[in-house]
């Protein structure tokens, strides 16, 4: 079903995804596209162009009842997260949760979950989204000056047509604060001793500029930065 929904999703907005040429039960195939990830060739100027491209080509707004959007967001954010926590606890019964991270007191997992402003998160913005808008999933061809999105999420709580725009914005924000390309290349350090954890990672070049650009975009469009 994941593969099927991914293909269905591309048909809702084919210009931003590669065209799937071959489909199997557990795989799909599309032609090689000559481009590099945004992590590899991004610049602050290009990031502004990316946001403009996303706004005009990807984030197509949908009009649906508020109750329907609330239902989808609750399923995607709350129900799915709670399910993943339960699965983790079941698979790791002896795991010691840290009480200190980088020297700061950290509430228990249960308290953190309770502190999340769920009601605010359930008020999403219905829009077509990528669903996993990490910078390594954004390709750019310098010669043609075109963007292409890969490795898209198949659906948002079952919906292939739309999801919550805030989710894409949050993915971008997270990718600025922590460069996932560095994580993949093991450019980070993690030490877990007893109930204490120390984490350090390499910052992305121009991260502060990217953050300001995204902050300005969020404010300009009257989005809720707290929710992002």
PLM feature spans:
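Conserved kinase catalytic-core helix
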Residues: 6-14, 37-129
């Amino acid at each position: 079903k994941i593969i099927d929904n991914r293909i269905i999703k591309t048909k809702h907005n084919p210009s931003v995804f590669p065209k799937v040429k071959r489909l199997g039960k557990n795989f799909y195939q599309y032609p090689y596209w000559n481009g590099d990830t945004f992590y590899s060739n991004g610049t602050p100027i290009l990031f502004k162009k990316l946001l403009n491209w996303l706004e005009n080509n990807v984030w197509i707004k949908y009009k649906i009842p508020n109750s329907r959007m609330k239902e989808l967001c609750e399923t995607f954010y709350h129900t799915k997260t709670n399910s993943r926590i339960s699965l983790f606890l079941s698979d790791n019964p002896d795991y010691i949760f840290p009480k200190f991270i980088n020297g700061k007191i950290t509430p228990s997992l249960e308290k953190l979950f309770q502190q999340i402003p769920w009601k605010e998160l359930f008020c999403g913005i219905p829009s077509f989204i990528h669903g996993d808008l990490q910078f390594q999933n954004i390709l750019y061809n310098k010669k043609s000056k075109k963007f292409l999105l890969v490795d898209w999420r198949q659906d948002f709580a079952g919906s292939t047509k739309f999801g919550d725009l805030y989710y894409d914005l949050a993915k971008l924000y997270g990718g600025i604060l922590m460069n996932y390309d560095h994580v993949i290349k093991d450019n980070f350090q993690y030490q877990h001793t007893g109930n204490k954890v120390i984490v350090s990672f390499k910052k992305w070049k121009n991260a502060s500029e990217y953050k300001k650009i995204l902050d300005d975009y969020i404010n300009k469009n009257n989005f809720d930065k707290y929710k992002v």
